[in-house]
């Protein structure tokens, strides 16, 4: 069991020891926002916020501009936001500063380990539209960046907590580590009115692969089984050097494809040029999706199929692997969302080789702005640990999770969470574990 844990940590957390590191000319700006394809006027921030996942920098910043569905409104900050709007309108530039602390507590832990963990992440992000701001422009080009500082509050790290402290083959609060300074995004995004685009640079692949509404570990579910690929994809780390393209094939059908360096290291990103061009170890993916409502709601009302392949990594002794993932999500009555998502992996370094998640969400103020507003989320997952990573004959795991995000103000939210983990695969002593969490977000 200890060997399996160390191997998982090597893949996900010790990327700084990989030769080189980092990647991305990433993926998929995928296609251009539909309104962009229909209008030749100057692009606005909200138009930029329509493609990519909820955690892409433009989408996240746009959600922070929403001023409804809050308990309080701080009037004294209005001049500050008006100043930011003026900068955006005049220069095409805007930014956000966010701080995310998290605390986790488990009902039991393995001998010699702690039963709680806490850390925090500071994030500074922004985008600058340098091309296509004229009224008659037929394309736009935008520079996007996201820099983080990840630091611990306790000896245990939330990102490693589930695996190390109670033998659960998975991650809870996956980005909450102690990497220190950490590059997540630095890429160029080009879009055309015909509905196609590309992104190239250092990107977070999870912004563009298997995108759906409640995917964010910063604002939504804590457990990775309710996020990208339901833990069945062998994903690169942040700041992966790669290239992606995408576009709308029809009014309601889109295609995304890309490849990224598997040896990315967000703490030393520019070494990614060496690993990208020398090691040739890539994560490749193609996704076709059908939007069941309007394009600007594509990650809310969506059915998509993602196929992926990860090359063998010689340095860390991980076999090549491949898999498929199918996702369905649908909103109704403006406030409710339901989802059913599942996939499989053959070999590779994914946590699970089979995984199915079902559940829903409820937002009293309406499902819409990603990661913003009061919101209830709940889900159930069945997962089978990956034999190629952990070894054979492990029990299947079952996960139940529920959270409620309280939007205190536009700048501050708090999200309590509870999880019930059944048959943690790497824990021979316990047949179930309770995990309690508290996460906050402060943003300006």
Name each region found by the language model.
Residues 38-40, 72-95, 128-143, 194-195, ...:
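Short loop/turn motifs that connect adjacent beta-strands in outer-membrane beta-barrel proteins
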Residues 39-108, 112:
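N-terminal regions that are enriched for targeting/export leaders
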Residues 85, 125-127, 187-189, 244, ...:
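Outer-membrane beta-barrel architecture
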Residues 95-103, 143-149, 198-202, 257-261, ...:
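Transmembrane beta-barrel strands of outer-membrane/channel proteins
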Residues 102-108, 150-154, 207, 226-227, ...:
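Sequence/structural signature of outer-membrane beta-barrel proteins
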Residues 156-187, 192-283, 287:
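Surface-exposed coil loops of outer-membrane beta-barrel proteins
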Residues 290-388, 402:
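Detector for outer-membrane/organellar transmembrane beta-barrel domains
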Residues 432-444:
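Outer-membrane beta-barrel "beta-signal"
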